Amino acid sequence: IDYDRHMYDGYNWTYINLPVEDIKPLAIASIKDSTAMYFSCDVAKFLDSKKGTLDLRNYDYESLMGTTFGMDKKQRIQTFASGSSHAMTLVGVDLDEKGMPKKWLIENSWGATSGYKGFLIMTDDWFDEYMFRLVVEKKYVPQNILDILRQKPTLLPAWDPMFAEDK
């Protein structure tokens, strides 16, 4: 993304766009090795800040409004209905008996009075819908994915819908 950097004359970030099912094992490996990760998401969607949960079942908007909300993640991004709005630190995961994630633990920057002592719990299906960016150390990434970084990146304009909300 053009101008997506945090210092004058710095480098733009380089992203690898992966399916969420390929991202989760990288995050799990990092957490199992006690390595936290930069994580960005659309934090306001289905957030219960008092309970400290990010869960698609927190609010029943469909019954309240008498309609369904049928857009998938791609459609929400393309119409600017969803985007990366807040960065936090991904620090934990709760796995089921098959090693699949059920929920994730995030350390937030809003202080100890927000969420549960400054932490949020995000369900795995919320992760699928509203996680946008995860920075994982290269040692957790398979070589076939790292090889993608050798390709010439496509520079997207600053107004690209993928990161238009990212401020």
Regions found by a protein language model. Give the residues of each.
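Active-site signature of cysteine proteases
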Residues: I1-K167
